[in-house]
Amino acid sequence: MKNSKKVIASVLSLSMGLGLFAGASLIGNKKAEAVNPIVQDVYTADPAPMVCSDGKVYVYTSHDEDVTVNNFFSMNDWKCYSTTDMVNWTDHGTVLSWHEFDKWAKDNSSWACQCVERNGKFYMYVPINAKNGTTAIGVAVSDSPTGPFTDPLGEPLVGPAPNYIDPTVWVDKDGQAYLYWGNPDLYCAKLNEDMISYDKDLNEDGFVKGIKRWDLETNDFKELAGITNEGGRIADGSYADDVSDACRQAQSEFGVGVRVDNNKVRRPTLYEEGPWFYGRNGHYYMVYAANGIPERIDYSMSDSPLGPWEYKGIILEENMEDGKGTGSFTNHAGVIDYKGHSYIFYHTGKLPGGGGYKRSVAVEEITYNEDGTINTAPMTADGVEAVEGLNPYQRVEAETIAYGKDVEKEDRYKGDDTNNQDRNLCDISNGDYIQIKNVDFTNYGAVAFEAMTSSDVTKGETAGHIELHLDAVDGEMLADYVVKGSGSFDTWTSDKVDIDKSKATGEHDLFMVFKGDADKEELFKFDYWQFTQMELPATPTPTPTSVPTATPVVTPAATSAPVQTAAASPQAKAPAKVKAPAKVKLSKVKAGKGKITLKLKKIKSAAGYRIAYSTNKNFRKAVKMIVTKKNTVTIKKLKRRKTYYVRAQAYVNNSGRKVYGNYGTTVKVKVR
């Protein structure tokens, strides 16, 4: 959100007065917990994930403006975020806007997009309102997944026509690319190899002038006009016994619609909008927003990329894991496989000030059965686990975060080239912070921290501080990095601070807490950071000592002294890199009066264990630790009738240092 601090403050003030957001997880206070939504500073929706050839996942989103126009969707551009670990997301900013299509498109209608990679180029398909008042799908092309994207056609790829929205593209193994779209009907075109055209002369296999259509509107089936909800027969789906063969076929493909509107059938099928088409292990999937309003995510499967489809069921329900609504009456999903896991992206209205017209992207892990069907997944506030640790010993952009409290980001152009841009954190004020998850300091640890910053404070004077904390906002402090003034926000400077190498080892969540003059709106800007790893001792080459020639000594026994040989010099050995222990399982947890007793499942390789406990489920504050060699531990002096969160990790010893494994599952315990 642009000026999000002011927006959040006004939202919180209003919500307190109206009694809204009860129990919500709010960005603007200490209760902020969720990793879902994955972006916290702007409203994002309609996620379109892409696994790129560079090894990263890119997620393209539409962008809900902070202020709506006519109390409706206000959307003018598309954002992009990337990750290699699924928990820390790098913000690439706006990668395309409706202005690129202003020859034929109108503003305030940058709906759900999708980007695909082919032959070294990236093709972004976007739906926009056309100047004639209907909708159309355009395409923009780039040499980079983050743009700049340009319109090669100067006109729509398909349309304009009513309800031409929500494009989804898949390139099949045989090289044929398919474009699906539509609300509430579903359409398909076969894209040519250039990805910016389709064969308009195709008139077979259900295609007419290059487009195939699935009739899914109520007025597509005349018999539905005479069906009412008398006896609840629409709501329970039993009316499907009295429909035509054509309607029955549509319902077999996309489910029996059970929405009622003025006592009539609102939709003959469950399909509503937002198709996501892909192939996997010989199966083809159509995932879509269904059964609105509020919408959930359903799917159908086929053995062919062109159907016929078979309705399979629900992936995401209408409500969150806690039974409460998502805060958004729409939903829109994207599905990928990445590094041995499968994920579904979707959106909610869970950010402060959020709702149906101000949405936020989230992600969950999903699983498939042997027959290819998908298991229903919960929508959670916790999100997903990291698939790998983040390397802190290379440059990390400051806008790469898992969670940010009150931080903003901005574009910074290099010289006059508006296509050559960077991004940085801005509007940093006292008490703001960012969280970077699963930072892997390795067994050897960090000895220094460097940051690139700018400020309007006089050069050399203190502009603020970056406190580095482990595992919580108030966790163990690695260092207090003093941000020096650079004289101007346009002038950048870097410095280093030393770190105790014994502290920064293993894998941790890293919190960067920003401190400074509480009355100043912007302390400094922050571009990137990097740790320095402890240098391993060099292994010296043994240098033999010179061997003196033995001199015979005459003795009464007339014996000669032996020749002396040089002894080899001992080699200095670097600490051996050891394997971190496995995750710890809590085999028994018992709550007592003001205490919790834990029994940890023993790990043979472990030298001991570290137990972390807190009243904050994401361990962002008030975290306490117990290090022990025992696998049965009692945590005492706890507040009675208070809920605590407990987790444990094992460690092994390596050259006098503890090397920790990852934490096991967090357990929620209410003390008696």
Predicted regions and their residues:
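Carbohydrate-active catalytic/glycan-binding domains of CAZyme proteins
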Residues: 32-480, 484-538, 570
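Short, flexible loop/turn segments at beta-strand junctions in immunoglobulin-like
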Residues: 499-503, 602, 635-639
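Beta-strand-rich modules
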Residues: 638-656
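Short, solvent-exposed loop/turn segments at the edges of extracellular beta-sandwich modules
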Residues: 517-520, 652-658
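Sec-dependent signal peptide cleavage junction
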Residues: 20-35
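Pro/Thr/Ser/Gly-rich low-complexity, intrinsically disordered linker/stalk tracts
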Residues: 570-605, 658-672
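Ser/Thr/Gly/Pro-rich low-complexity, disordered linker/stalk segments of secreted
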Residues: 537-579
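Extracellular low-complexity, O-glycosylation-prone stalks/linkers
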Residues: 606-625
